[in-house]
């Protein structure tokens, strides 16, 4: 069996096609893969575990059913960093620190959402350090939901405006920071999302060694992919539901 890694699904009540694709994937893959890793921004927005909106309930219930047979690991993204203990309990998922070093099928992988690598975006990194402080997160979680919704809308609008004003390279992973991480975790392969620029990169580190980095695809019309990991390494998963047949031997369509 293989391990499946996804990120940047950005699921919401406004993405019924993606929600359905994810639910079908969970149903088909349960018990058929070693583990599922979700490396952040699974949800377009997460305002707290107490949000009673009907949309996330279907995803949480499906994750819980899936987790009874297959481990699920979830990392916070910049959109859903308020995922908390109640979400973990109700979904059956294990929340991961960012970054997290794991060993899968005999190989070491350094997993991250990816926003920490974008160090050229100084304004965003300053905001991230501020908003991720534990006392600020506690305060956010205890604000009235209606106020959190207004704050969330404002932050998303500010994010869209900021992206339009920034050069593309600023919002990409810094090669220098990538190299620093890979040196610190020698012998590992880095896997991350966030940048929405899927690809496979080889880096020559300052000590002369070679290292690999895989960038996960975001989900968008015509693109609902991820990465498979097995004993032979990392493989693109352009259509994980269809790919299950290859990696498990089971027909899914």
From Swiss-Prot:
One Gene Ontology molecular-function label: manganese ion binding
Amino acids binding Mn(2+) 1: 8, 10, 41, 196
Binding site for substrate: 78-79, 121, 159, 163, 166, 194
Pfam families documented for this protein: Metallophos (PF00149)
Cofactor (UniProt): Mn(2+)
Main location: membrane
Keyword annotations from UniProtKB, A to Z: Cell inner membrane, Cell membrane, Hydrolase, Lipid A biosynthesis, Lipid biosynthesis, Lipid metabolism, Manganese, Membrane, Metal-binding
Localization per record: Cell inner membrane
Coiled coil: none
Topology of this chain in the membrane: Peripheral membrane protein
Annotated GO CC locations: cytoplasm; extrinsic component of plasma membrane
Top enzyme class: hydrolase
InterPro entries to which the protein is assigned, alphabetical: Calcineurin-like_PHP_ApaH, LpxH-like, Metallo-depent_PP-like, UDP-diacylglucosamine_Hdrlase
Pathway: Glycolipid biosynthesis; lipid IV(A) biosynthesis; lipid IV(A) from (3R)-3-hydroxytetradecanoyl-[acyl-carrier-protein] and UDP-N-acetyl-alpha-D-glucosamine: step 4/6
Entry's family note: Belongs to the LpxH family.
Record's protein name: UDP-2,3-diacylglucosamine hydrolase
């Amino acid at each position: 069996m293989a391990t499946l890694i996804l990120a940047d699904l950005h699921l919401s009540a406004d993405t019924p096609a993606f929600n359905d694709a994810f639910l079908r994937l969970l149903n088909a893959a349960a018990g058929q893969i070693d583990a599922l890793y979700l490396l952040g921004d699974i949800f377009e927005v997460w305002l707290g575990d107490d949000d009673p909106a009907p949309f996330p309930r279907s995803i949480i219930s499906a994750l819980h059913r899936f987790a009874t047979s297959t481990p699920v690991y979830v990392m916070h993204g910049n959109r859903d960093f308020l995922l908390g203990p109640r979400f973990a309990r109700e979904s059956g998922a294990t929340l991961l620190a960012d970054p997290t070093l794991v060993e899968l099928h005999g190989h070491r992988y350094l997993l991250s959402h990816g926003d920490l690598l974008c160090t050229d975006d100084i304004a965003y990194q300053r905001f991230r350090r501020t908003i991720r402080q534990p006392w600020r997160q506690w305060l956010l979680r205890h604000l009235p939901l209606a106020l959190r919704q207004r704050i969330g809308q404002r932050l998303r609008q500010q994010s869209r405006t900021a992206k339009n004003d920034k050069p593309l390279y600023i919002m990409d992973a810094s090669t220098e920071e990538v190299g620093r991480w890979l040196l610190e975790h020698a012998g590992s392969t880095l896997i991350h999302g966030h940048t929405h620029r899927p690809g496979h990169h080889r880096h020559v580190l300052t000590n002369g060694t070679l290292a690999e980095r895989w960038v996960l695809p975001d989900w968008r019309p015509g693109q609902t992919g991820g990465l498979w990991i097995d004993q032979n390494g990392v493989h693109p998963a352009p259509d994980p539901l269809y790919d299950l047949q290859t990696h498990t031997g089971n027909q899914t369509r």
